[in-house]
C-alpha cells in the first residue's frame, strides 16, 4: 500500500490534468477471514559467518539458544525456534526465555533472529540491503536451503511461520 501511495503521488505531480479517474487512483484489495489464511515460513540464507568458524558461531549461539543437532532435516515445529543448516548438519535452535520479549513485534521469530543472530553475531544490520543475506520463500522448501548452502551460502535458517493472530497484533 505504501508503494502504491508513492506511485499515486508521483503520477499526480506529473499530470496537471489529473481528474481522479486514472487507474493510479485505485488500489486492488481483497478481504479473507483470518481463519482461512495461512502464512508460509520466510527463510534466510547467509553467505558467510563474518570470519567465525562453525564452532565459534555455534558457541556464540549458545548464549541465547538451546541447540540440538538433528538427525534429519525438518522445519521448525513451534514459535521461538528455528532450524539451521550449517556444514551439512541440521540443528534446532530454541530461544531461551531471557530473550523472548513481551512486545508483539520483538516476539516475532524474525525479530529474534535479527536481534540475536544476524545483527550481533553476523553483523547484518539491515537485512533488506545487506548483500550477504538472501530470503527464501517457504514454498521452496528445505531442499532449496540445502541447495543454496552447497553453492553460495554458508548457513541457512528456516523460520516457523508467523500466525495471522501475531501479524494482526
List where the protein language model places each region:
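Surface-exposed, charge/polar-rich loops and edge strands
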Residues: 2-169
